[in-house]
């Protein structure tokens, strides 16, 4: 009885194994990859520049909010 149940499963597995590996996906042309590198580097540089330019303003806001918090803090006298 078990042989009858396992026979279709064995046939399907055998067919999958004999089919072989799936075909590889086509790789993009290497020339187009090399031509996109300068644009990618320029975009990365612009993003990095924008990030570094925003650091002083963010630090200023953080320090201002910290100073305001200290001004509003009321400590009881001991």
From Swiss-Prot:
InterPro entries: ApoC-I. GO terms for molecular function: fatty acid binding; phospholipase inhibitor activity. It comes from the Eukaryota. Residues 1-26 form the signal peptide. GO terms for biological process: lipid transport; lipoprotein metabolic process; negative regulation of cholesterol transport; negative regulation of lipid catabolic process; negative regulation of very-low-density lipoprotein particle clearance; triglyceride metabolic process; very-low-density lipoprotein particle clearance. It is found in: Secreted. Keywords: Lipid transport, Secreted, Signal, Transport, VLDL. GO terms for cellular component: high-density lipoprotein particle; very-low-density lipoprotein particle. Inhibitor of lipoprotein binding to the low density lipoprotein (LDL) receptor, LDL receptor-related protein, and very low density lipoprotein (VLDL) receptor. Associates with high density lipoproteins (HDL) and the triacylglycerol-rich lipoproteins in the plasma and makes up about 10% of the protein of the VLDL and 2% of that of HDL. Appears to interfere directly with fatty acid uptake and is also the major plasma inhibitor of cholesteryl ester transfer protein (CETP). Binds free fatty acids and reduces their intracellular esterification. Belongs to the apolipoprotein C1 family. This is Apolipoprotein C-I. It comes from Felis catus.
């Amino acid at each position: 009885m078990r042989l009858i149940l396992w026979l279709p499963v064995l046939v399907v597995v055998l067919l999958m194994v004999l089919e072989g590996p799936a075909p590889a996906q086509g790789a993009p042309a290497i020339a187009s990859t090399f031509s996109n590198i300068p644009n990618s580097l320029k975009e990365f540089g612009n993003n990095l520049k924008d990030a570094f330019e925003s650091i002083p303003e963010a630090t200023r806001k953080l320090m201002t909010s910290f100073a305001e918090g200290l001004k509003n803090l009321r400590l009881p006298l001991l």
